[in-house]
Amino acid sequence: MSGRRSRSRQSSGTSRISEDQINDLIIKLQQLLPELRDSRRSDKVSAARVLQDTCNYIRNLHREVDDLSERLSELLANSDTAQAALIRSLLTQ
């Protein structure tokens, strides 16, 4: 009983999200992940796996952005064309 009271006190000042809303968000995340998007609807994937795969996917995207930024910087540093100057100015804005 005290556990229920403490939970209700903790959430009284914040908006609550229903279990159905959480499940809908998990399904939406699953549809965004390439590895899980292709799994059949009948295949039940746990929410924990969806969240873990989402975190891994975001980390990989960050790494790709960092790598591409580095490659672009190297290409622009080695190029003295007007187009490269324009791209450099756009990137520093």
UniProtKB/Swiss-Prot annotation:
One of its GO terms (cellular component) is cytoplasm. The keyword Thylakoid does not apply. Expressed in root and shoot meristems, and young siliques. Low levels detected in all aerial tissues. It is found in: Nucleus; Cytoplasm. GO terms for biological process: brassinosteroid mediated signaling pathway; embryonic root morphogenesis; gibberellic acid mediated signaling pathway; regulation of growth; root development. Residues 6-61 form the bHLH domain. Keywords: Brassinosteroid signaling pathway, Cytoplasm, Gibberellin signaling pathway, Growth regulation, Nucleus, Transcription, Transcription regulation. Homodimer. Interacts with BHLH 147, BHLH148, BHLH149, BHLH150 and IBH1. Interacts with SIEL. This is Transcription factor PRE3. It comes from Arabidopsis thaliana. The gene is PRE3.
